[in-house]
Amino acid sequence: MKKDYIKIIDKIANWMNQTLTEAKSNGFVYGVSGGIDSALICAIASKFFKDRSLAVRLDIFNSVNDTKDANLVISHFKVNSVDKNLEQVFNTFIKDLPDNKLALMNLKSRLRMVCLYYYAQTYNYLVCGTSNADELYTGYFTKFGDSGSDFIPLANLTKTDVRECSKILGVPSQIINKDPSAGLFENQKDEDDLKVSYLEIDNFLENNPISESSKNRILDLHKISEHKRNMPKTILKLGEIIK
């Protein structure tokens, strides 16, 4: 069945507005990375929340292309925005820490989250996450990093859905067609990390047939990332402990 993406976009915008109203929030803040997911949020912000949103471009040794693409998205949609360079903060933070590539990559995402929440609290805004359904199901996000948000409008959109909505809202084609990347290191590509394509994840989430090996890979990613999607595990109630 063909999806009505115009209706989907309207439903998302209405849900976002309801979320802000319930929280008695003045608006929302979101990071713009140069990727398609944050570009779609930027497009929605421009169309429905022009004066109640703030795009933040957060630089921590970003690639030249990601910086250009983030600036393109912000200028294209003419949204309220600020730039914040966190490279000095990052360098100071890691100065006396042991070297660990994965921890350093995730630190970038966590520093960005901290900065977004600073702006959010300053303006009585909520932090808008940009993760899509594929990323959330497979755990392809940084715990307390890009997952650190108050609401996630794209949570039930597959990567294909994100692309189709982006086309409708006029996201530049170079953003839609670029290889998905978290941008945490040079030449990084999401599908290389996931070891499965977004199309296969999309089909899995839509209950369409995929290869058994891809299905097992997706299920394994979901299983090992379960802790990322839940609140911190708590101990039993005292009454149950001392039985």
UniProtKB/Swiss-Prot annotation:
Its EC number is 6.3.1.5. One of its GO terms (molecular function) is NAD+ synthase (glutamine-hydrolyzing) activity. It catalyses: deamido-NAD(+) + NH4(+) + ATP = AMP + diphosphate + NAD(+) + H(+). Deamido-NAD(+) binds at residues 110, 143, 150, 227-228. It is an enzyme of class 6 (ligase). One of its GO terms (biological process) is NAD biosynthetic process. InterPro entries: NAD/GMP_synthase, NAD_synthase, NH(3)-dep_NAD(+)_synth, Rossmann-like_a/b/a_fold. Pathway: Cofactor biosynthesis; NAD(+) biosynthesis; NAD(+) from deamido-NAD(+) (ammonia route): step 1/1. Pfam families: NAD_synthase (PF02540). Catalyzes the ATP-dependent amidation of deamido-NAD to form NAD. Uses ammonia as a nitrogen source. PANTHER family: GLUTAMINE-DEPENDENT NAD(+) SYNTHETASE, NH 3 /GLUTAMINE-DEPENDENT NAD + SYNTHETASE. This is NH(3)-dependent NAD(+) synthetase. It comes from Malacoplasma penetrans (strain HF-2).
